Amino acid sequence: NFEETYETIEQIGLLTNRLPEAKKINEDIQMKLEKLQQKVENVEPKSVFFVVGVQPEIYTAGKGTYMDEMLSFLNIKNEVTEPDWPSYSAEDFIASEADVILTTYEPDIEALKANPLFATMKAVQSNQLILVDGDTTSRQGPRLAEGVESIAKAVYPELFNE
């Protein structure tokens, strides 16, 4: 989670005799996150299905995951209510009413678009299958704010038309 990320950055700073720099990194992350949260706080929440793999079943980021925390932070509803990394059958996936489907792996987008079973899904029909950077959205570290921002821009692009 975010707190563990901050703690890890400070622990590394402590171990490398660079605690002031580590604290500055955390301050910068928190400042960027605060700005992002302010951008999305009054927006109508969208729902997301965050796909992390499509073979042989559809795997997704569930409750309590780092990705789920990013979604919650951004006023985004995670369509997945199960904890951890549950798998979904095609039938259960189709039943999803997600506004947006995110993934970190480009071939997954092509696989989802190519499967006629998924053609009726809201996110597929509205072409809301979006690739986000896997390094920043699935790995905890000093690029936390970049990952959160990439999700925010993918789900709420209208807020970033500057």
Identify what each model region corresponds to:
Residues 1-15, 87-125, 131:
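Acidic/His-rich segments in extracytoplasmic proteins that coordinate ligands and/or metal ions
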Residues 1-55, 77-82, 127-162:
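Extracytoplasmic substrate-binding proteins
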Residues 10-11, 62-66, 115-118, 144-146:
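Short, glycine/charged-enriched secondary-structure capping and boundary segments
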Residues 37, 59-63, 113:
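Short, well-ordered secondary-structure micro-motifs
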Residues 40-55, 69, 94-109:
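Solvent-exposed helix-coil-helix hairpins and adjacent flexible coil/strand "hinge" segments
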Residues 56-59, 83-86, 110, 116-122, ...:
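Flexible, active-site-adjacent loop/turn segments at secondary-structure boundaries
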Residues 59-86:
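Alpha-helical, coiled-coil/dimerization segments enriched in small aliphatic residues
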